[in-house]
């Protein structure tokens, strides 16, 4: 429809892929790449109602939906659906995190088009960046190939959420290449930075720095993204945070 109508000012997402099993034969399921509209389709849902749906393999049975779409050529960032399909019409717990310069329509749409988003099942402020040499790139960026690469993740969790981060997974070209446990990492990797809020609560915050060693740095084309799991009351939260990929150009 985007291509047929020639719409110039629009943004489109791949919404809840694979969710409606009963109508799967009629769903746009192949993620066929189209260079004429690649700049218009900007997001893919990784959380929708039942998060378990998106932890399983995608249409091909081997990769997650986000990986199938990205490996088809799309430049995408993850988002969540906030609707709950609840008869009481209450919002779901999933969140879309948009890293914008200010709280305005223009800034939010600019961030969306730059793919500076993340998807989470609980409120968290998060910003990931890639450090290539001395140049820093925000999440969703196309970054140059290099012999050195660091992924930096800054986060703030409101204290009232009582949620901790359990582990972080580094996925390179759709495969988990590293798992970092966050409960027992050294202070060099995770530094608490207390910050005050208007309510006086002190959120948990920190910075996670991950060195991607040379053998694991993908060549072009390639991509890297983070998947972060949380825990609450000692139990693992099954729906992870998805951070927008960094694309190797």
Where are these regions (language model features)?
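Extended, charged catalytic domains and RNA/DNA-binding interfaces, predominantly
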Residues: 1-249
């Amino acid at each position: 429809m985007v291509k047929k109508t020639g719409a110039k000012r629009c943004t489109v997402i791949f919404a809840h892929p694979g969710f409606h099993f009963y109508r799967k034969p009629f769903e746009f399921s192949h993620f066929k790449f189209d260079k004429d509209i690649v700049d218009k389709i900007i997001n893919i849902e990784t959380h929708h109602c039942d998060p378990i749906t998106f932890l399983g393999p995608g249409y091909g049975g081997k990769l997650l939906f986000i990986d199938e779409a990205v490996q088809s050529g799309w430049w995408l960032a993850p988002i969540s659906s906030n609707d709950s399909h609840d008869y009481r019409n209450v919002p779901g717990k999933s969140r879309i995190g948009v890293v914008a310069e200010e709280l305005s329509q223009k800034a939010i749409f600019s961030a969306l088009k730059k793919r500076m988003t993340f998807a989470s099942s609980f409120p968290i402020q998060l910003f990931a960046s890639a450090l290539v040499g001395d140049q820093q790139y925000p999440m969703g960026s196309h970054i140059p190939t290099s012999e050195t690469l660091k992924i930096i993740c800054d986060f703030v969790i409101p204290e009232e959420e009582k949620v901790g981060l359990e582990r972080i997974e580094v996925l390179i070209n759709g495969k988990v290449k590293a798992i970092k446990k966050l409960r027992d990492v050294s202070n060099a990797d995770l530094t608490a930075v207390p910050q005050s809020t208007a309510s006086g609560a002190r959120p948990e915050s920190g910075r996670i720095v991950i060195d991607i060693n040379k053998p694991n740095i993908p060549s072009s084309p390639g991509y890297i993204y983070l998947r972060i799991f949380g825990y609450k009351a000692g139990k693992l939260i099954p729906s992870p945070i998805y951070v927008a990929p960094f694309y190797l150009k």
